[in-house]
């Protein structure tokens, strides 16, 4: 057994995984239990009181985290005319129409976000089989189908997180990196949870946010005591 495995085993022996942890304790334990050399992401899983089998209770939205998520975001923009220069100035890595579509078909996906102006959607929809499974299809709700290209690119670059529930009514997202200061993680978490609250379907009854678990890429998952959060 190597040193990292021994250290992780020792750490796990002192963690009660059935306990609801104070948010400060949760972050401290996640940082303490990180044994890998790379900068792990801090991920959140939220169990919601929704019926995912009913379309009117499914959630799909986005929010901009104040401290970003700790990595650079590559943006592809489908647009034309004057918007090409605007997209370039805003920092988009890939810009085009039919030419960009052909590039994606031949070379695959090497970007994190797709933004499109309404007039470009006729081209983007043809990429549904490529973009759809990766949750990259532009969407008006998410602000990725827009006439304000500059703002959409800025949001994507500065920490916009797009989320949707899975078939079990759970939302998964990244809210930061293990090297973030504790207050930065808490600020991101609070903004993310506020967005989740605003996205609550009117048809959802009973307890809405049932359970919150924070984890790292290769580390442990800890349940958070919601009474210690700014909910």
From Swiss-Prot:
Disulphide bridges: none
Repressor is among the record's keywords: yes
Record flagged with keyword tRNA-binding: yes
Signal peptide: none
Gene Ontology cellular-component terms listed: cytosolic large ribosomal subunit
GO terms of molecular function: rRNA binding; structural constituent of ribosome; tRNA binding
Highest taxon above the source species: Bacteria
Assembly behavior: Part of the 50S ribosomal subunit.
PANTHER family, per the entry: 54S RIBOSOMAL PROTEIN L1, MITOCHONDRIAL, LARGE RIBOSOMAL SUBUNIT PROTEIN UL1M
Function according to Swiss-Prot or TrEMBL: Binds directly to 23S rRNA. The L1 stalk is quite mobile in the ribosome, and is involved in E site tRNA release. Protein L1 is also a translational repressor protein, it controls the translation of the L11 operon by binding to its mRNA.
Family affiliation: Belongs to the universal ribosomal protein uL1 family.
Protein name (record): Large ribosomal subunit protein uL1
Taxonomic classification: Bacteria, Pseudomonadati, Pseudomonadota, Gammaproteobacteria, Enterobacterales
